[in-house]
Amino acid sequence: MENVNMVKSKAALLKKFSEPLSIEDVNIPEPQGEEVLIRIGGAGVCRTDLRVWKGVEAKQGFRLPIILGHENAGTIVEVGELAKVKKGDNVVVYATWGDLTCRYCREGKFNICKNQIIPGQTTNGGFSEYMLVKSSRWLVKLNSLSPVEAAPLADAGTTSMGAIRQALPFISKFAEPVVIVNGIGGLAVYTIQILKALMKNITIVGISRSKKHRDFALELGADYVSEMKDAESLINKLTDGLGASIAIDLVGTEETTYNLGKLLAQEGAIILVGMEGKRVSLEAFDTAVWNKKLLGSNYGSLNDLEDVVRLSESGKIKPYIIKVPLDDINKAFTNLDEGRVDGRQVITP
């Protein structure tokens, strides 16, 4: 692979929205400057991939054909002359590459840079044997964690950590806070476990329509589970009628935000992570009079990724991984779209 301009790579290409991804050989450029070429060890499948595949979440700069996949980890095989990493290291790839010039990038908030590059959305991602990373600054080194275990941390883990950091001021208002996690899927795997790892005095209530997913929430560490229709009586019982300190909404529809708002204590908040709906809804009187909040939470910081990697390496976060060969990626998309996945599917080239 030394001194070549292109590297052949088998990859899953999105050529037409909502049609099966095409498995083809593509050319990946040799890294230059700060760039790094990694051999993908694992690439997680996220609901965002589904939305991009369906054509409902196209970022500025999106072009077809494209290799999807923004939850990526692997091994460094080639580096540009300015890259500050070395070959052979296992790494996980941060998934929003800021332009490094805006006021938010100067604060390290690359996740809200309007000119961000996102692998799998505005540049080729990791559903491939090899992936070119724009700069070594977007890599977090793995010590004991395998790339397959680390891949979902690039988004699901980092997004969960980012949401929890936003929730901390509200959780700390109460001596025995009750935290709602709404929507038990790939994100909840990490949200529930991180909450348990960081805070010992909280009570977690997992909400899902599916009994299977409610049982899964208990396995992850939730203290109680409920359907939304029964949640009010449970929350009132747990808090003597006060309400929950925080609700982390991993679904994000008008119905979920409205119902969760009614479950909050005064000065409680919803951290909105999911984007399954087009709008959110809260009761104006209830929200204004009781000082309730709705906060958006998009992804997380490089430090969030670093922290969730170290929590995983210390054994405080257990991976729930379903390995899927690259050739079966379309089956993985179907399974996720039809709600048949507990944990995180990880594509292995």
Curated annotation (Swiss-Prot):
MF-aspect GO terms: adenyl nucleotide binding; alcohol dehydrogenase (NAD+) activity; anion binding; D-arabinose 1-dehydrogenase (NADP+) activity; zinc ion binding
Chain residues that bind Zn(2+) 1: C46, H70, D155
GO biological process: arabinose catabolic process; protein tetramerization
Protein name per Swiss-Prot or TrEMBL: D-arabinose 1-dehydrogenase (NADP(+))
Chain residues that bind Zn(2+) 2: D99, C102, C105, C113
pH dependence: Optimum pH is 8.2. Is more than 50% active in a relatively narrow pH range from 7.3 to 9.3.
Alphabetical list of SUPFAM superfamilies matching this protein: GroES-like, NAD(P)-binding Rossmann-fold domains
Organism: Saccharolobus solfataricus (strain ATCC 35092 / DSM 1617 / JCM 11322 / P2) (Sulfolobus solfataricus)
Function according to Swiss-Prot or TrEMBL: Participates in a pentose oxidation pathway that converts D-arabinose to 2-oxoglutarate. Catalyzes the NADP-dependent conversion of D-arabinose to D-arabinono-1,4-lactone. In vitro, can also use L-fucose, L-galactose and D-ribose. Shows highest activity with L-fucose, in combinaison with NAD, and lower activity toward L-galactose and D-ribose. When acting on its physiological substrate, D-arabinose, shows a clear preference for NADP over NAD.
Family that this chain belongs to: Belongs to the zinc-containing alcohol dehydrogenase family.
Keywords: Arabinose catabolism, Carbohydrate metabolism, Metal-binding, NADP, Oxidoreductase, Zinc
InterPro entries, per the entry: ADH-like_C, ADH-like_N, ADH_Zn_CS, GroES-like_sf, NAD(P)-bd_dom_sf, Zn_alcohol_dh
